Amino acid sequence: TAPSEQQKRREILQELLGTCHPMTGIEPDFHCDYGFNIHTHGLTVINYNCVILDTSPVNIGAGAFIAPGVCLACSGHAVDPGQRSQGIGTSAPITLEENVWIGANATVCGGVTIGAGSVIGAGSVVAHDIPAGVIAAGVPCQVIRPITEKDKIRPEDILF
């Protein structure tokens, strides 16, 4: 839809998603497997070119920001080549707790919970749970440090 068609966007999201909080915004292009397994629970911003492979539930907490190009992938393929050639796969839920920020082009794998307030660096591959209140990044994604008072932007440095 065009940016000017906000009401139409809301109607599409209400129909597509399992739970769609009124303050959920998704920019195009957006792709998902089913939609009904995606649940937003407050202000949620899903930026351009995101993919959610929702073969299991995906719960997105209030205040979540998902940057451009992020992939939330509940599904996976068998590691064993014989099973993979038979089309055997796996699926596990993903949970983003409140106030999580996922950086651009990151991938979150099935079975992962990202704790409240955490930030995932751009380009990361998150294959294991991340605790609350930390900055984590890398391939594989690892905790770098806790978020502290020093991370607050000073009022004179706020641009918008």
Feature annotation, model-predicted:
Residues 1-12:
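An accessory alpha-helical subdomain
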Residues 3, 30-40, 45-113, 139-140, ...:
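Flexible, glycine/small-residue-enriched loop-and-beta-strand segment within the central core
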Residues 16-17:
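N-terminal helix-cap/turn-to-beta initiation motif at the start of protein domains
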Residues 101, 119, 135-137:
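Short-chain dehydrogenase/reductase
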Residues 113-115, 130:
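Extended beta-solenoid/beta-helix repeat architectures
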